[in-house]
């Protein structure tokens, strides 16, 4: 009841952001109502059971001390007949069983799937420094070659001849990014501490995870259809079957997550620190930025001089001879 009031009467701001449309709010309320029904059913069952025990009815042996039901039963059902009490006890039992089974079936359609996914997601959370991006083998090998250094030793793949950097769609994200999206509880703690969101920008880390999950489900439904219309044109053929490697429906994550949103991110890691189940909304944002910069040569105009300076002089300030000067103040390890 308290949590329902927080969402619907007090209306805490993090529960009423733009991405919290009718369905996410209804989903949360349905679960809370189900929990209220479950607790009510258990209390009814145990309260009636307690009174039946006191009456010495057959098939109702002592179950031990029940602090709430032991007080509630005599208060509610004192003077009731045994037949009515048995009916109430059975009603409570069936009601709690149906709520539990209904909840299990509903889980696959609800954000409350995180009940099962929170532990594995936490277990597989990255242990390296937060905000650190993984290197791209193709680029690292090119850089090593340019600098006359030996190759990193990572094997070349078939896609290395025409690589795609970053993530345009869910196929460019890792399995952990997808797991993060399905583990999201939509609690809004990440968005509540996001400095970009707090200053009125459109970025909401929670919305990013919700959009990834929704896009994943959309792609999965189309893949399951097996329709040839979703096969990329240059991959179509007589015996070609639809799969994630040749999938193309003309849409992408950028149709859900705008450039304005991903460019508003300051990479401060506040969202990562705030998540109770160690979801990392920053990584998919950075992967989408990679695609935007490396594949489409897009980005805010303010970023262009920085990239040009890095390319020409290896320093954002275009002073290559002084770029390592700051290290002179550090003690040798």
Over which residues does each language-model region extend?
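Iron-sulfur-cluster electron-transfer modules
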Residues: 2, 9, 172-175, 181, ...
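Catalytic cores of large soluble enzymes that bind and process phosphate-bearing ligands
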Residues: 83-86, 104-108, 176, 182, ...
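Short, glycine/proline-biased beta-turn/loop segments that scaffold the active-site neighborhood
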Residues: 212-214
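Membrane-embedded alpha-helical bundles of multi-pass integral membrane proteins
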Residues: 1-154, 206, 210
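Flexible gly/pro/ser-rich segments immediately N-terminal to CXXCH heme-c attachment motifs
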Residues: 22-23, 29, 86-94, 173-185, ...
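Glycine- and acidic
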Residues: 84, 101, 175-177, 189-196, ...
